[in-house]
A protein has these predicted regions:
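Internal, well-ordered domain-core segments that constitute the primary functional module
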Residues: 133-221
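Long, compositionally biased stretches enriched for glycine and/or charged residues
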Residues: 190-475
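Glycine-rich phosphate-binding loop and adjoining beta1-alpha1-beta2 segment
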Residues: 24-58
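Short acidic low-complexity segments
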Residues: 63-76
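N-terminal Rossmann-like dinucleotide-binding module
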Residues: 2-29
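Conserved NAD(P)H cofactor-binding loop of Rossmann-fold oxidoreductase domains
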Residues: 86-89
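Rossmann-fold NAD(P)-binding glycine/threonine-rich loop
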Residues: 92-162
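An anion/phosphate-binding loop that grips the pyrophosphate of nucleotide cofactors and donors
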Residues: 79
Length: 475
């Protein structure tokens, strides 16, 4: 049976989804599971949780714990699959720093984990650690597949694919939920008859085709999107809305509360949580995979000191990621007992790609995924060294990506503005030169639209100093 190593196993809820899924899969249920983390308490909590699932499911997985950098190589030794879910520097202090220093310069952000100055510095903290993983893997499990879930996805996956020999694919939820989110939001409903084609880059891949029973849904999507952004789309009663957005399935309490808040906001003000994406679709012609709060900071159009009214007009949640971190910390306190001290804990297989990929590689039964891979002629009007997100087939032969050809020119053009930052950040991680960090941030669409070159350099210098414990190579 395969060995699965989970890097960052203290991500307890995510470990439950990925490794719980493996325990629910016949081809993987007897796997040897190696949990690795640098936080003793979180590692122990994840192990307790997974042991309960293993026992209650009747699985025969062998669960092992590896604590700290000195045990990392042993955790990886002989692995067939390595799942990466680390965060270097955590919420406090690094995420706080990623928001507070730019704010001093007048640069406002929403999520700051994928692009912009926050995304660049998150990548520069993380790439050296992941390359350490890669060096160990090249020694003790050179044929393993690395399944990367950590952001910034394109930068980290691109670094692994160009700076190591490890077979790597980047995985993100946004492709899976793109069409269901769009169609349900617009009261069109999503079902198995819907077929889609999605390609581009992570967090900015494009819904190129969306059909139901062969009928192009885009004309109706755009008609409803315009009404929705004008506050004129009829969305029904709360009970009808809830059933539509949840596909009739039960929701965790916190999600239902947030959906109700969104519903009430729309009823009261005509504003909603996806206004940026729908505006981009109406202007560029195609819907983007990742959320409005992300895409508000990937472009120069929405967060602008000169036009402060855009924040309210498009319902842009500035400083959203720190709020989420605080909420997750608070919610973890209530979930800890449920997950780590519940002897009857069970699990239902989720939609996470990881177990389906491993199952396909073990059994040879193929599965289609959206994967982040190197652009070796896949999207012909994007740079060849870019990390692109395209449909892929996983089977016993590995990951086979699909050739897309040219994207619509306006879509490729917007992607290239983000790719510039991604490639320059990977170059900065390779050269360890401050000048390359400056260039990466200078190329960022949102940052360069708001700050002068001198301010960008000063901001980067201050960020480097603040992050010196996690980025000693640049200090």
């Amino acid at each position: 049976m395969p060995k699965i190593t989970f890097m960052g196993a203290g991500s307890t809820v995510f470990a439950k989804n990925v490794l719980g899924d493996c325990m629910m899969t016949p081809a993987l249920e007897e796997s040897r599971i190696a949990l690795y983390d640098i936080d003793r308490n979180r590692l122990e909590e994840s192990a307790l949780m997974l042991e309960a699932i293993n026992r209650n499911n009747g699985s025969k997985a062998v669960i092992e714990k590896y604590l700290g950098v000195s045990m990392r190589k042993e955790a990886l030794r002989g692995a067939d699959y390595v799942v990466n879910a680390i965060q270097v520097g955590g919420y406090d202090p690094c995420t706080i720093t990623d928001f507070e220093i730019p704010k001093k310069y007048g640069l406002r952000q929403t999520i700051a984990d994928t692009l912009g100055v926050g995304g660049v510095f998150r990548a520069l903290r993380t790439i050296p650690v992941m390359l350490d993983f890669a060096r160990d893997m090249e020694e003790v499990c050179p044929d393993a597949w690395l399944l990367n879930y950590t952001n910034p996805m394109a930068m980290l996956t691109g670094a692994m694919l160009t700076m190591s020999s490890i077979r790597t694919v980047g995985l993100c939820h946004s492709v899976q939920v793109c069409a269901p989110t769009l169609l349900n939001e617009l009261c069109m409903g999503y079902d198995d008859r819907v077929q889609v084609k999605i390609a581009g880059i992570n967090h900015q891949a494009w819904l190129l085709e969306c059909t139901r029973d062969g009928e192009d849904l885009y004309p109706e999507i755009k008609r409803r999107a315009k009404l929705y952004n004008e506050g004129k789309l009829e969305i029904g009663t709360w009970e009808e809305r809830r059933a539509m957005l949840s596909n009739g399935e039960p929701l965790p309490g916190q999600w239902e509360e947030r959906m109700k808040e969104e519903y009430d906001l729309y009823r009261k003000t005509g504003r909603h949580g996806d206004m940026v994406r729908l505006e981009l679709m109406l202007r560029f012609g195609y819907y983007i995979t990742e959320s409005s709060e992300h895409n508000a900071e990937y472009t120069p159009y929405f967060i602008k000191q000169r036009y402060p009214e855009l924040i309210g007009r498009f319902n842009i949640p500035l400083d959203e990621y720190p709020r989420r971190c605080i909420r997750q910390i608070e919610e973890w306190e209530s979930r800890r007992e449920e997950l780590t001290k519940n002897p009857m804990l069970t699990h239902e297989r989720s939609r996470e790609y990881a177990s389906y990929i491993m199952e396909a590689m073990e059994t040879g039964h193929p599965v289609k995924i959206g994967g982040n891979v190197l652009n070796k002629g896949l999207i012909t009007n994007l740079p060849q060294r870019a990390c692109v997100e395209v449909p892929c087939m996983a089977d016993r032969n590995g990951i086979q990506p699909t050739v897309i050809g040219d994207l619509p020119e306006q879509c490729a053009a917007l992607n290239r503005t983000n790719i510039n930052v991604q490639l320059m950040t990977v170059e900065a991680a390779r050269t360890r030169k401050r000048e390359d960090i400056y260039r990466a941030v200078m190329l960022d669409p949102h940052t360069s639209a708001e700050l002068s070159i001198d301010d960008i350099v000063s901001m980067c210098d201050e960020m480097i100093e603040a992050h010196r414990d996690w980025m000693p190579e640049y200090s």
